[in-house]
Amino acid sequence: MRSSSPSQPPSIKKAHRQAKKRAIRRRRIDLDCGCSIYFHIDCAGHGFTHRGAHHCTSGREWRVYLGDRKSPLFQDKPSRGHAIHQDQDIQRPNPVQPQPQESIGSPQSIPELPSLDDIDDSFWVELFS
C-alpha cells in the first residue's frame, strides 16, 4: 500500500517567495503638528517623543495600510483620552537656550596667555634645538 504522504516534503521556497512579496503592514499616526509616524502593526503600547510632546502608538486617528497598491482603510477610534501626555508636576526647561554674550576680543586667543609674536626668538631656538 502506498503512503499518503509524499517521500519528499514540499519546498519551502514557494512560501518564502510569497512572504517576501507580502507588504509590511504598518500603522500610520497623524499628529496634530501635521507630521505622520509609521509603526509596525505589532508595535503597540510604546510611546515616543516628537517636538517635545510625548505620544502613544495607540493614537486617536490611525490608518492601516494593507498593501502597496491598495487604498488605505481609514479608522477613527474613539479617544480614550489625550494622545499627548503632559504631566504638570514635571518642570520643563525653557526650549529656547540662552546664547553666550559676545565678547569684544578675538575668540581665537586666550587672554591669560601671551601672544606667540611677543615670545623672544631665543626661546624658539632653545625649544627646537
UniProtKB/Swiss-Prot annotation:
It is found in: Host nucleus; Host cytoplasm. A motif (Nuclear localization signal) lies at residues 13-28. Residues 99-109 have a biased composition (Polar residues). Residues 1-23, 73-117 are annotated as: Disordered. Residues 1-12 have a biased composition (Low complexity). InterPro entries: Gemini_AL2. A zinc finger (unnamed) spans 33-50. Keywords: Activator, DNA-binding, Host cytoplasm, Host nucleus, Host-virus interaction, Inhibition of host innate immune response by virus, Metal-binding, Phosphoprotein, Suppressor of RNA silencing, Viral immunoevasion, Zinc, Zinc-finger. One of its GO terms (cellular component) is viral capsid. It holds the Pfam family Gemini_AL2. Monomer. Homodimer. Homooligomer. Self-interaction correlates with nuclear localization and efficient activation of transcription. Monomers suppress local silencing by interacting with and inactivating host adenosine kinase 2 (ADK2) in the cytoplasm. Interacts with and inhibits host SNF1 kinase. Binds to ssDNA. Strong activator of the late viral genes promoters. Enhances the expression of the capsid protein and nuclear shuttle protein. Acts as a suppressor of RNA-mediated gene silencing, also known as post-transcriptional gene silencing (PTGS), a mechanism of plant viral defense that limits the accumulation of viral RNAs. Suppresses the host RNA silencing by inhibiting adenosine kinase 2 (ADK2), a kinase involved in a general methylation pathway. This is Transcriptional activator protein.
